[in-house]
Structures are given as structure tokens and as C-alpha cells.
């Protein structure tokens, strides 16, 4: 059967030349998309950059809202989900499809943020700041631990690995698989200014529902990193980030695996407090951060007990 797909880009229309590079990359694919669909947030003007064949659809603004869509415009078996600041080599999509089918996958992801290539000092910073650890594995690209943090393969010798999470910038899905994940049920997280971890929610939900998520370390896809250029006040950002990460742990771990996850999360919190206290003692960190982290944790706990949050459908209910 002939492989056909539609490309779906989420954007605010502000990525400029990086967005144009994304469009041009799609046009130059060895297997070009049947449609290039651009889902732009309501209230934003259409980008001036164009290749003349893309179709625009206005949708509600949000990292999840602009991804968790019914995709009524898609009339192919496969859908390529993209951010608006990528370069894809001409054979990238063809390789994604071949890798997916040859490994019996349901979704194929490009590893656009190569953690394993970071410097030793950067990896050490991730361990102490966000609890992200390197790991050795012949099977997994990323694993989600019981405390809600992820571990990454520190020495991927093979190109393609199974995964429990992935970067969301570039992924090829079977459309029916994506719809079955019901990512729209996670739109609650768009209430926050910027829902960090939304890609973890998407791919871990697919994994927990029995779908085979793959990551290819050799795909020629480059993240050009347009960014929004908008940064919240540090205090608000820290509080929100801690609250979001608590809720992601609550949703992906506690709800799915039960109380066995609680000791791991407590150890994670204690480690965060100890590290913050040490930095405060050494006067190398903002003395207010620990207080903000505690406020963020309290905020997350309060939200987890709200009727609106408790009414969300089960995370791993297939």
C-alpha cells in the first residue's frame, strides 16, 4: 500500500525564516505530504512566509490545544506532527516511515534534543536541578521513573529504540493511534502559561495505552529553536513549573501505578530541598527559590484535589 501522510504544524505565526525552512523542507521531501496543514492560534495574523501550498486552520491557542485536534482535514492513514522551527533533510519522512514499519511501531519520533551529547557539566546540572539521569539500555531511549522524572539513554549504539517518552517537535503517527490516545483530555495543562512536559504527557500516554513508541537517533531532523522570546517572572515560572511537574507525576505515575510511586516522589522532593538549601548556604542560588518550590508543590496538591482535575478521564484507560 502506498504511504501517504498529511503534515500538521502548530504555530503562532511568529517563527519567521525558521517556519519557512520547515515548509520548504516538507516540499522537498522524497515523499512529500499530501497536505501541509498549519494550525495557527486564533487572533494571530497569518505568516508572510509561504510556499503557496499550505492550508491554514485557526484553532484555540495552547501547546496542547493546537496539537490535540480532531484533524478532520486529514485524509491519510498517517499524520506528521511538527513544530514550526525545524529542518528536515529530504529523506527524513521516508526514513521515519521505513523505521516505523520495519520495527512494528505505531509512532516514530526524531530525537531533536540529544541529551546524550551534552557536556558532563550539563548532565550533572540536570541531575541536581531537575532529577534527569543518564542510563544504559539496549532497549529504551527514554524511561519514566516512578518519581515522574525521565532517564535518557546515555550511549545509544543503535539507531532506533523503544521509548516511554520523546520530544514532541517531530513525530510520525498512525492517525487512528493518535486519536485513540485522547490527548485532548490533557488540555487542562494549557491553563498554565507554558505547559512544560506536554510531550511527556502525549508519548507516555501512548506508551501506557499499549502503543509502541519509537525514537530514531539518526534521523536528519534539526530543531532550529525559534522560541517565543517571552519569559515570565522567575517567581511565577518556578511556582508554575513545580506545580505542573507534580501534576504530571500525579497523572502519569500515581494514577497509573498507585502508592508505590509515593516513596520515589518523596525522595525527589527531599533531594530538591537539600540541594536548594546547600546552594542557599553557599550563596550560589536565589534564596527565595526554595520558598517558591514549596508554594508550587502546594499549588499542585490543591489542584489535584479540585473537582475539575479529578473529573479528568483516566490517563492509561485504553
Regions found by a protein language model. Name each.
Residues 24-33:
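Short, acidic, metal-binding catalytic loop of nucleotide-sugar glycosyltransferases
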Residues 91-136:
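Conserved donor NDP-sugar-binding/catalytic core segment of glycosyltransferases
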Residues 1-25:
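N-proximal low-complexity "stem/linker" segments adjacent to membrane-targeting elements
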Residues 63, 144-145, 152-173, 194-195:
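A recurrent flexible, glycine/aromatic-enriched loop bordering the glycosyltransferase active site
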Residues 204, 208, 212-288:
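Active-site-adjacent helix/loop segment of glycosyltransferases
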Residues 58-74:
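Glycine-rich, basic loop-to-helix element that forms the pyrophosphate-binding segment
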Residues 166-168, 189-204:
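Acidic donor-binding loop at a coil-to-helix junction in glycosyltransferase catalytic cores
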Residues 79:
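Short aromatic/hydrophobic "clamp" motif used to bind/position activated sugar donors
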Amino acid at each position: 500500500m502506498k504511504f501517504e501522510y498529511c503534515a500538521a504544524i502548530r504555530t503562532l505565526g511568529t517563527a519567521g525564516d525558521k517556519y519557512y525552512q520547515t515548509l520548504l523542507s516538507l516540499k522537498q521531501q522524497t515523499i512529500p505530504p499530501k497536505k501541509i496543514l498549519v494550525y495557527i492560534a486564533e487572533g494571530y495574523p497569518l505568516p508572510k512566509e509561504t510556499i503557496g501550498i499550505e492550508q491554514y486552520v485557526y484553532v484555540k491557542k495552547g501547546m496542547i490545544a493546537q496539537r490535540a485536534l480532531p484533524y478532520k482535514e486529514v485524509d491519510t492513514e498517517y499524520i506528521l506532527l511538527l513544530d514550526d522551527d525545524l529542518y528536515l533533510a529530504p529523506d527524513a519522512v521516508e526514513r521515519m516511515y521505513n523505521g516505523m514499519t520495519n520495527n512494528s511501531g505505531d509512532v516514530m519520533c526524531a530525537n531533536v534534543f540529544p541529551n546524550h551529547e551534552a557536556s558532563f557539566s550539563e548532565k550533572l546540572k540536570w541531575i541536581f536541578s531537575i532529577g534527569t539521569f543518564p542510563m544504559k539500555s539496549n532497549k529504551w531511549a527514554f524511561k519514566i521513573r516512578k518519581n515522574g522524572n525521565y532517564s535518557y539513554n546515555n550511549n545509544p549504539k543503535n539507531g532506533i529504540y523503544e521509548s516511554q517518552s520523546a520530544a514532541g517537535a517531530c513525530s510520525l503517527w498512525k492517525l487512528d493511534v493518535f486519536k485513540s490516545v485522547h490527548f485532548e483530555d490533557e488540555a487542562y495543562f494549557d491553563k498554565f502559561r507554558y505547559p512544560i512536559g506536554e510531550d511527556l504527557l502525549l508519548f507516555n500516554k501512548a506508551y501506557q495505552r499499549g502503543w509502541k513508541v519509537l525514537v530514531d537517533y539518526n534521523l536528519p531532523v534539526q530543531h532550529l529553536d525559534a522560541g517565543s522570546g517571552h519569559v515570565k517572572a522567575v517567581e511565577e515560572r518556578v511556582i508554575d513549573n513545580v506545580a505542573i511537574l507534580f501534576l504530571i507525576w500525579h497523572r502519569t505515575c500515581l494514577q497509573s501505578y498507585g502508592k508505590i510511586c509515593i516513596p520515589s516522589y518523596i525522595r525527589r522532593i527531599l533531594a530538591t530541598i537539600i540541594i536548594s538549601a546547600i546552594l542557599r548556604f553557599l550563596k550560589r542560588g536565589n534564596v527565595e527559590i526554595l520558598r517558591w518550590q514549596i508554594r508550587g508543590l502546594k499549588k499542585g496538591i490543591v489542584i489535584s484535589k479540585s473537582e475539575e482535575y479529578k473529573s479528568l478521564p483516566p490517563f492509561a484507560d485504553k
